[in-house]
Amino acid sequence: MARITVETLIKNVVDKLRASRTAAISSVVQNGNEYTLNTLKTFDIEKGNFISVLGFSVYVVEVVENVSIKVETSNDLTTAVEWEALQPYFYYGDPIDMNNEITAGSNDQDTKYPAVIMFEVKRSKYSIQRSDLIDFTPRLRLFFMDQANYSDSTINDLYKTVDSMQDLAEEFINQLGITPHIYVQDSDYNLNKHSKWGVKVIRSSRQQSETLFDNNLTGVEIEIDVPIAKSLQFSCLC
């Protein structure tokens, strides 16, 4: 049996966050290419996000909290009874490869954020005791990021996004805590806030560097040890 990888585990947790952002549509009002979806739950969806309706990715133009979501699309949504969030997105790997994935095939990168970004796992602690329930404990660095307008935003504006991403990080930790075969209930984690975040790499010399990720990003970083039980390798991620 193939081992379940850490990135598969974390992707599953992020999928649960996305699945929790699904709600019924009580009625639909059409006005040309705009559709007002009356719904009792809007969660953290904002203008500029994309949501899924009838399998179509549609652009959000207005949100009235827990009342309605207005979207723009050329597709017919008049029969819609449910909407689903497309966020948060999940990216894993080294920064260069992730940036290439995010920017590939789309000029509209609003569809790619907010996101949970996980760097490659470099360090794990393994148990050699046969009686130990824990298989190994990877140390994870996760970034919860959304786009921000650096040039026109005040520090207070940026920290509204930081606070929103901290809420998402805490939601992630809570979901991780109820994931079978994971033992983080008694763990601590470090959290760093980034009003302006980027990853710098050295290109041709130590005097020259380049910031990766082609978007202005704001959010939080967490570092946490995640004890994973041996039983996970004989189970499904359900």
Please provide the spans of the model-predicted regions.
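Short, charged interaction patches at domain edges and termini
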Residues: M1-T22, K125-D135, V184-C238
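Short amphipathic alpha-helical segments
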Residues: T5, L9, D157-L168, F172
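Extended low-complexity, serine/threonine- and proline-enriched intrinsically disordered segments
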Residues: L9-K16, E46-S52, M165, A169
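Small/polar beta-strand repeat architecture
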Residues: T22-N33, L40-I45, S52-I102
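Short beta-strand micro-motifs in enzyme catalytic cores
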Residues: N33-T36, V67-K70, F136-P138, T218-I222
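Short, solvent-exposed beta-alpha or beta-beta edge segments that form flexible loop/patches at the rim
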Residues: I51, P88-N156, K200-T218, F234-C236
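Short beta-strand-to-loop capping motifs
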Residues: T73, F144-Q147, I224-I228
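Acidic, metal/cofactor-coordinating or nucleic-acid-engaging core segments within structured domains
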Residues: M165-L191
